[in-house]
A protein has these predicted regions:
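Conserved ABC transporter NBD signature motif
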Residues: 50-63, 70-72
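Helix-to-loop junction immediately C-terminal to a conserved catalytic motif
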Residues: 46
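Conserved beta-strand-loop-alpha-helix hinge in the C-terminal portion
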Residues: 205-232
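Q-loop/switch helix immediately C-terminal to the Walker
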Residues: 76, 80-82, 86-103
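Conserved ABC ATPase "signature" region
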Residues: 106-124
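The feature captures the beta-strand-to-loop junction immediately N-terminal to the Walker
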Residues: 31-33
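Conserved ABC ATPase signature
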Residues: 128-132
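ABC ATPase C-loop
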Residues: 145-146
Length: 261
């Protein structure tokens, strides 16, 4: 699998000699200590903050991509507690976005139908956006970013106000869509195992990047940046040390069964 996005020797006020790559069609999670630079990093990838000769889309410096080409490759939603809808309902929002895409009427209709169904928003399209829940607004915001079928979706802090069940549902929706590379940030490690890779930032540097399970086994590195293991992962690793379980067990019922064998 090829790297769709690569950061090479990034040096600025926030990062020093940062090197990291993201594989195509994988889901990548970035977390770390407070003020570790993860939100700034997403803004750099999204082109909100300029960066020259450091970020590459399939070996092409994104700073040289024309704005139209950049907007077709990237979609992003940075959650900061507020939303930026233009119209009073989702139906108008979607149709407005579709007006800017070079699609036939049948393609527009199909995209409208498919995305609203996948995101579970079909019955809320004519409701006032102000009446939607935070979860519905977050799903709607991300759905709008996917109307132009970007190759890369950048998400910052979208899980912050969601329950674990809502967060997992959102990740499941994005996986069902397929064909996109997701780079997302989170405050903690609770959702780490829902992703394909996990990167830990600290003070503008990359501490570790690997498969989530391998990173979660790096106790000393996680402790240095003040991150705590998810409860079931922590319990599994301790029990595995004493040969009470063979691997990480995330389901509590399965854990009980394993211990009673």
């Amino acid at each position: 699998m090829i790297n769709i996005l690569t950061v090479k020797n990034m040096n600025n006020s926030c990062f020093k000699d940062l090197n990291v790559a993201f594989k195509e069609n994988d889901f990548h999670l970035i977390t770390g200590s407070n003020k570790c630079g993860k939100t700034t990093f997403i803004k750099l990838l999204a082109g909100i903050i300029e960066s020259e000769n450091a970020i590459f889309y399939k070996q092409r410096d994104i700073s040289f991509l024309k704005s139209i080409e950049f907007s077709t490759l990237f979609g992003y939603f940075l959650y900061n507690g507020s939303f930026h809808f233009i119209f009073s309902n989702l139906d108008q929002e979607i149709l407005h976005r579709l007006d800017y895409l070079d699609l036939s009427p049948s393609e527009r209709k199909m995209k409208y139908k498919n995305l609203t169904q996948i995101f579970g928003l079909g019955e809320y399209l004519t409701n006032s956006i102000s009446d939607l829940t935070i979860f519905q607004k977050i799903k709607a915001s991300i759905m709008l970013e996917l109307l132009h079928s970007p190759k890369i979706l950048l998400l910052d802090q979208v899980f912050l106000e969601l329950s674990e069940a809502q967060s997992k549902e959102l990740i499941s929706i994005l996986r069902r869509i397929g064909g996109i590379t997701v780079v997302a940030t989170a405050q903690d490690l609770d959702l780490a195992l829902e992703f394909d890779s996990l990167s830990i930032f600290n003070n503008g540097t990359l501490c570790v990047k690997n498969s989530p399970l391998d990173v979660l086994k790096e106790d000393s590195k996680l402790n240095k940046v003040g991150l705590s293991l998810p409860f079931m992962v922590d319990l599994s690793l301790k029990l595995k040390y004493y040969d009470l379980v063979d691997d990480v067990v995330l389901d509590i019922d399965r854990m009980v069964n394993e211990l009673w064998k």
